[in-house]
């Protein structure tokens, strides 16, 4: 049987994160698939190529934004927006977002592919207008800043930012609703995202949790758990590191914050001697922290959340709010505990109570690590391949 011709559409390759890791696994699932993204930076391109190469022999080289990457079957196609992104310094991509939907609607997909798989945050589903082939959307989240007013206000940072994001949000909602009826199938990365797809798009979704590179994170029983809790991740408002800091202060504990971002300066003003900021750090430092902390704190609501799974792969329990992607990953009494979701005061008090009474000896690190194994890339590739094959008919 002839292998299907698959196109993969992502919104941008300007940095490497969880959604780019998903695309890397897409490429391993469908070798030779063409990859399209309106905005591609050199760093973003090279990070994707390295991630794909890590799962097979040979590392493809960079020959421009539209290339067949060193015989590895990866062709990455961008647009004029890549050059515009470089011209404005290669930093923030937000000024280019209004041009992304039109660019996606003009992708050269017609009559070239049997199925198109899009990796969607806000605009990728616009590719549905560029082809008559079945389009299957893997949704990291419907544009949360577009649909959720509270989230938008939290992220915008001041009145001018709120106005700009409100306008862009209206634009994104219209784009998503226009594309949704034409999708052949929707796959959500968590049950919380599936609920958003149902409520905002009016569509059902199959849940396939994203892959987590747990091979990089393993337990070490010879390393004892120490007397500190860990927050790891980008220091941006919605991650709610501020709640972790306040909860540890309330409980009289110690906290290590691993990560960096625009919210760090504010966080340092509310933290005291109980909190240590390590900044951004390589994997070996993160691994060491996962192995030594009493537990990882997850006070923010994530669409999925990679950090809890990485921590559990190292045998570390996770204390998380009972909302969002944590409902897919944390098992109370086995791999961690939930804090009842509520306002900031309730979350801080609930997490402080867990911290005060927390006893890591109640949890089996080996069982926690085995649970994390269910999110391994091999499991993801098997599930996504099966779901797409059935949806594409």
Report the location of each language-model feature.
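Acidic donor-binding loop of glycosyltransferase active sites
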Residues: 291-303, 316
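Membrane-proximal helix-turn-helix segments that form the acceptor-binding/catalytic region
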Residues: 154-186, 194-195
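Conserved acidic donor-binding segment of nucleotide-sugar-dependent glycosyltransferases
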Residues: 279, 332-333, 337-346, 354-362
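Conserved donor-binding/catalytic core segment of Leloir-type glycosyltransferases
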Residues: 220-256
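Nucleotide-activated donor-binding/catalytic signature segment of Leloir-type glycosyltransferases, i.e.
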Residues: 265-288
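A charged, aromatic-enriched C-terminal amphipathic alpha-helix characteristic of glycosyltransferases
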Residues: 98, 342, 359-389
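Short hydrophobic beta-strand element within catalytic cores of glycosyltransferases
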Residues: 297, 317-322, 330
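Active-site donor-binding segments of glycosyltransferases and PAPS-dependent sulfotransferases
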Residues: 29-125
């Amino acid at each position: 049987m002839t292998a299907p011709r698959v196109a993969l559409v992502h919104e941008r390759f300007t940095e490497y994160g969880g959604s780019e890791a998903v695309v890397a696994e897409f490429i391993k699932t469908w070798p030779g698939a063409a990859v399209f993204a309106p905005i591609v930076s050199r760093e973003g391109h090279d990070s994707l190529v390295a991630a794909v190469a890590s799962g097979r022999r040979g590392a493809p080289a960079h020959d421009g934004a539209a290339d067949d990457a060193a015989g590895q079957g990866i062709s990455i196609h961008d647009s004029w927006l890549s050059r515009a992104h470089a011209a404005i310094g290669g930093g923030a991509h937000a000024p280019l977002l209004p041009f992304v939907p039109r660019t996606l609607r003009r992708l050269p997909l017609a009559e070239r592919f049997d199925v198109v798989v899009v990796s969607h945050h806000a605009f990728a589903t616009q590719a549905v207008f560029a082809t008559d082939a079945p389009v299957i959307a893997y949704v990291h989240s419907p544009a949360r800043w577009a649909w959720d007013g509270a989230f938008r206000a939290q992220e915008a940072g001041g009145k001018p930012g709120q106005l700009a994001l409100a306008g862009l949000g209206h634009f994104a909602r219209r784009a998503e609703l226009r594309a949704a009826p034409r999708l052949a199938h929707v796959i959500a990365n968590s049950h919380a995202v599936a609920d958003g797809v149902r409520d905002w798009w009016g569509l059902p979704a199959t849940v396939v949790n994203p892959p987590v590179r747990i091979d990089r994170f393993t337990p070490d029983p010879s390393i004892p758990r120490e007397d500190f809790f860990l927050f790891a991740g980008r220091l941006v408002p919605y991650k709610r590191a501020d709640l972790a800091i306040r909860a540890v202060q309330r409980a009289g504990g110690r906290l290590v914050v691993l990560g960096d971002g625009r919210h760090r300066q504010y966080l340092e003003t509310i933290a005291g001697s109980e909190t240590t900021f390590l900044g951004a750090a390589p994997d070996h430092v993160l691994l060491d922290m996962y192995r030594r902390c009493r537990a990882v704190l997850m006070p923010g609501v994530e669409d999925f959340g990679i950090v809890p799974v990485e921590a559990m792969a190292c045998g570390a329990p996770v204390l998380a709010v009972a909302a969002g992607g944590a409902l897919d990953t944390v098992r109370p009494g086995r791999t961690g505990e939930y804090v009842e979701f509520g306002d900031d005061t309730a979350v801080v008090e609930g997490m402080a109570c867990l911290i005060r009474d927390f006893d890591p000896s109640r949890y089996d690190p080996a069982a926690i690590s085995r649970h994390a194994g269910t999110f391994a890339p091999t499991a993801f590739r098997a599930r996504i391949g099966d779901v797409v094959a059935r949806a594409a008919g």
